[in-house]
Curated annotation (Swiss-Prot):
Belongs to the TTC9 family. TPR repeats lie at residues 8-41, 72-107, 108-141. It holds the Pfam family TPR_19. Keywords: Repeat, TPR repeat. It comes from Rattus norvegicus (Rat). This is Tetratricopeptide repeat protein 9C. The keyword Repeat applies.
Length: 171
């Protein structure tokens, strides 16, 4: 069990190095490998194949903390990588960012990435929700502010069109 945690940590660190080098596909591969090492160790998740094989000893609180930290970091880093790759898979960015936010609801980077994903998926209400939360945590971040402005603009445009549509229906 300790070995799997160490291997997962090593894969995560390799992924971080690949990310710094701009090798996003390689980084994604390393983060996925790290998560695979952790599969079945997380007591909060159901086992993929119940009642198969011996049940390992329970994780200590320290091991569980390490496991959750590695998982959260990997999901956050996966979202960052995917935003750098073409074509961007916004559904995955949203999914990974939300996994981070389940454990760390205040994580500014995950809030921002979720907002960006929802924006590009044209769910502007959700984008606004996440970007407002991100701007509250990082008020000086120009990217967060820019995406919040773009989202507000799209929402205003949508509401203007909606208003004109209803005026046309009842005129």
């Amino acid at each position: 069990m300790e070995k799997r945690l160490q291997e997962a940590q090593l894969y995560k660190e390799e992924g971080n190095q690949r990310y710094r080098e701009g090798k996003y596909r390689d980084a994604v591969s390393r983060y996925h490998r790290a998560l695979l090492q952790l599969r079945g160790l997380d007591p909060s998740l159901p086992s993929p194949i119940p009642n198969l094989g011996p049940q390992g000893p329970a994780l200590t609180p320290e091991q569980e903390n390490i496991l959750h930290t590695i998982q959260t970091d990997c999901y956050n880093n996966l979202a960052a990588c995917l935003l750098q790759m073409e074509p961007v898979k916004y559904e995955r960015v949203r999914e990974y960012s939300q996994k981070v936010l389940e454990r760390q609801p205040e994580n500014a980077k995950a809030l921002y990435r979720a907002g960006v994903a929802f924006f590009h998926l044209q769910d502007y209400d959700q984008a606004r929700h996440y970007l407002l939360a991100a701007v509250n945590r990082q008020p000086k971040d120009a990217n967060v502010r820019r995406y919040l402005q773009l989202t507000q603009s799209e929402l205003s445009s949508y509401h203007r069109k909606e208003k004109q549509l209803y005026l046309g229906m009842f005129a």
